[in-house]
Each structure stands twice: as C-alpha cells, then as structure tokens.
C-alpha cells in the first residue's frame, strides 16, 4: 500500500484516537498526544461527514472534559488546528480552548 505523507498522518491520528477512546473506556486519563489525537479525529471525521467548520470548531471543544485528562494537560492545550477535507475542499479548523 502506497500512502502519501498526509494519508499516513491521518492514519496515525485515527489510530491514536482509537487508543485514547479505549483508555477512556477503562477510566484512564489521557495524556497530551492522546487528547490532541481524539480532538483531531473528531474534527476530521466531522468534516468527512459534511459538518460545517463553525459547528466543528464549537463541538470540538466538548469532546473531552478536564476530568478525562491528566493534571496540567488542559492548561497545555490552548488551540488545536486540524487540516480537514470537507466536501468543498480542504480547510484549516481551529478549536480554541478544546478542554473545558
């Protein structure tokens, strides 16, 4: 299978998000990369489903709560920027203060 670097990145984010979901199911708090991956995957999949940018920017801030991440992680993540493919092209989506 020949994948472009962009496709490899998307696959890696998707896999990291799957690991994060499993850890949350077990009650394990997420670390920095897991939290970023979960939020990023939410945005990428939402874009694929055709949800508008503004909706994803708002909804992305409700994917993870402070009680689901390790201490100090919420303060480390101020913005998450994801380049996602929408039906009308690729756009940069920024989720501000994603862990509340």
UniProtKB/Swiss-Prot annotation:
Main location: cytoplasm
Subcellular locations according to the entry: Cytoplasm
Catalysed transformations (reactions): urea + 2 H2O + H(+) = hydrogencarbonate + 2 NH4(+)
Coiled coil: none
Superkingdom of the organism of origin: Bacteria
Record's keyword terms, sorted: Cytoplasm, Hydrolase
Pfam families documented for this protein: Urease_gamma (PF00547)
A GO cellular-component term linked to this record: cytoplasm
Record-level GO BP terms: urea catabolic process
Family matches, as CDD domains: Urease_gamma
PANTHER family: UREASE
Protein family according to the UniProt entry: Belongs to the urease gamma subunit family.
Protein's recorded name: Urease subunit gamma
Lineage, uppermost ranks: Bacteria, Pseudomonadati, Pseudomonadota, Alphaproteobacteria, Hyphomicrobiales
Gene: ureA
């Amino acid at each position: 299978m020949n994948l472009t670097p962009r496709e490899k990145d998307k696959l890696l984010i998707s896999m990291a998000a799957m690991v994060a979901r499993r850890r949350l199911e077990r009650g394990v708090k997420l670390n920095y990369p897991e939290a970023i991956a979960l939020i990023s995957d939410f945005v990428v999949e939402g874009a694929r489903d055709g949800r508008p940018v503004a909706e994803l920017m708002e909804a992305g801030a409700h994917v993870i709560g402070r009680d689901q991440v390790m201490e100090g992680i919420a303060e480390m993540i101020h913005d998450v920027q994801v380049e996602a493919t929408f039906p009308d092209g690729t756009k940069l989506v920024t989720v501000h203060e994603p862990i509340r």
